[in-house]
Every structure is written in structure tokens, then in C-alpha cells.
Amino acid sequence: MIDYMNVYPRGEHASNLGCVIAKNIADHYQLPSFIVDPVAVDEMEDIARFTGMPEIRRMSLFHALNQKAVALKASKDLKKDYHELNLIIAHLGGGISVGAHQKGRVIDVNNALDGDGPMSPERSGSVPIGPLYKMVFSGQYTLAEIKRKNYGQGGLVAYLGTNDGAEIKKRIDSGDQEAKFIYEVMCYQIAKEIGSCSTVLKGKVDAIII
């Protein structure tokens, strides 16, 4: 597991450090270390993995810790077992993932790390592939620069120069129409992704949780 995380096979993220840190502490104090609640889970239906390119499959890479925790809390509030419910859960952070939870399994979800789904405060989300590959092969950008446009310097940061929601709210309240419009663009894309998950669940949705 340590070797797997050190090469970032599914993308660079701070959560990859968890097991490495745990192992270092455990080795130092000669104690066992465990993964109890995984950072990511893969419960996707096979049909959700396929794309129009046989070489590329969709991956289950999302904010599983938060989505699962929120699902359990919501189930308690609804006085039902998580494994009896169909839920749509939207994690709204620096990255945004929206999952279709069917009877305790996340059967489809956007990959918030690799530019799948809505734009977020600092990620581009899905973009048309034609203009993207023209950018990639234009000679004007390095691979690292393209990656930053997708992850870290995309979304609200790319348009408004900040990922700070409080600052953007102040700008909107002061009459900044560009900030208002771009924020609405992000909200539109989130709502669209939620609607997509409703289709995955065949319209049988017990709750939408944001």
C-alpha cells in the first residue's frame, strides 16, 4: 500500500499521505497501524465505468469519507438504514463530487480529481475534449501547466482569481456581476450533475444531500 501511494497511481492528493504517516508512526513506536475508513471506495456499476474510448475507463475517485459519513448521518435523521435508501450526495469543497448512493453502494460518481463533473472552486470539471487537445499540442503549455489548469488553477480560481467563497460573496454583494455569473455557472453545473445521478437511480431518490 505504501509503494502504491508513493507513485500516485490515481492522482496526487494530500489524503495519499495518511497511510504513509501512520506506518512511520507505527514503525517508530513498534505498534500496528490500520486503515479503518478508506479515503476512496470503488462500488461503481460496470456500466458506469465505460467511455466512448475503449482505452479509457472511468474511475471511482471521489470524497468517499465525507459522502459516506454524511450518508450515515442523513440515514439516522431519516430514521432508516443506509442500505435501504437511495441518496444523492454532493460534496462541495475545493473539489466537487456528486454520488448516486443505491442501497449503501455508490454506484456512480464523478471523478473530482481528473476533470470529471462540475467545475469547482479550484478545478475545471468536464471540458470539451477538442479544444483541450489543441491546447495540449499547441506547444504553449507543459504537461504540468495543463494539469494545474485542471486541478488547482481551474474553476473559480481561473475566472475570479480566488477559491475563497467568503471573498466571492463580498464581491457579489457589492455588485460584481462577473463574480455572480461565474458562481451561478458552478451552481448550474452542480445541479446538472445531481440531475444526472437522479437518472442513474431511475428517479427513485429518497433524499438529496448537499
Regions found by a protein language model. Give the residues of each.
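Short beta-strand-loop/turn "lid" adjacent to the catalytic site in phosphate-handling enzymes
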Residues: 1-18, 40-49
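Glycine-rich phosphate-binding loops at beta-strand->alpha-helix junctions
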Residues: 205-210
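Adenine-nucleotide phosphate-binding core of ATP-dependent small-molecule kinases
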Residues: 148, 152-203
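Gly-rich Lys/Arg/Thr-decorated short loops/hinges at beta-loop-alpha junctions or inter-strand turns
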Residues: 2-5, 49-54, 170-178
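Glycine-rich phosphate-binding loop plus the immediately following alpha-helix
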Residues: 19-25, 35, 42, 50, ...
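Phosphate/pyrophosphate-binding catalytic cores of soluble transferases and nucleic-acid-acting enzymes
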Residues: 91
